[in-house]
Amino acid sequence: MILDEIVEDKKKRLPGHMARIPETEMRRMAEETKTREADCFYNHLKKPGLSIIGEFKKASPSLGTITSKIDLMERISEYNASVDAISCLTEEDHFHGNVAYLKEIRAKSSLPILRKDFMICEYQFYEAKVIGADAVLLITAILDDAQMHDFYQLARELELDVLVETHDEAEVDRAMKINPRIIGVNNRNLKDFTISLEHTRRLRPYVPEDKVFVAESGITGDEDVRFLRDCGVDAFLIGRAFMESENPKALAQKWKELYQA
């Protein structure tokens, strides 16, 4: 399965990161890194109306290279004027991400930043804090219950918000055991990368109304926005549609107005 391959490649990558900066040093740096604004990711998504997380990614296993022509700073400037938070891929092998991209975004944006990666060890959480992330992603499909609990607690101790990602009823049930404030449904099946917004519709009743409910992936047009609005979604995480758009600011404004209609 593609997901297993991604996780295995992540395990191979981590020793190199740790060799450059040992975990004890990364932890010390994380503990000394001042929190920019506590709970900012959660607060930006919790506000009334539709919240949008604009994603920066250069590639994905399902699409290959999305575009090689986009300038990072130009796209972030557009996001600064249009979205409520930014998601940055830092996975190197399959999404062509890099922690350097997140650092650059942090230097140019005051918006909350989600580090989107396959988080499988404590080191990555310390690193996320140090490079300037405000939130991290926990993917239920790649973690057991003990890891979910421990990683969530670690993130909150570091004053990082957490987006807990699910894909089916069993994963939502597992996610709810840690009582997350933000829970997402990935409409893309990470095992075969097929997409269906029906996952969000089907899982909405399982998520309490007091949680911020995020729809991830597969949002490409007006009909998708209407469908997810009617499902009771609080926020969208949008990658490809914004990365391929010539005017993401106008697209975000259009979809926010459509959501309110």
Residue ranges and their predicted role:
Residues 127-147, 185-192, 233-251:
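Glycine-rich phosphate-binding active-site loops on the catalytic face of alpha/beta enzymes
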Residues 3, 102, 137-138, 143, ...:
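Generic leucine side-chain signal with a strong bias for well-ordered alpha-helical environments
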Residues 123-131, 153, 172-182, 200-207, ...:
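Electropositive, surface-exposed helix/loop patches at the edges of structured domains
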Residues 114-143, 148-151, 155-158, 163-166:
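Hydrophobic, well-ordered secondary-structure scaffolds
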Residues 82-83, 108-111, 130-136, 156-160, ...:
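Glycine-enriched alpha-helix->loop->beta-strand junction motifs that scaffold or abut catalytic
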Residues 1-113, 120-122, 154, 159-179, ...:
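Conserved N-terminal beta1-alpha1 strand-loop-helix module at the mouth
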Residues 182-224, 229-238:
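Catalytic-face loop-and-helix region of soluble metabolic enzyme cores
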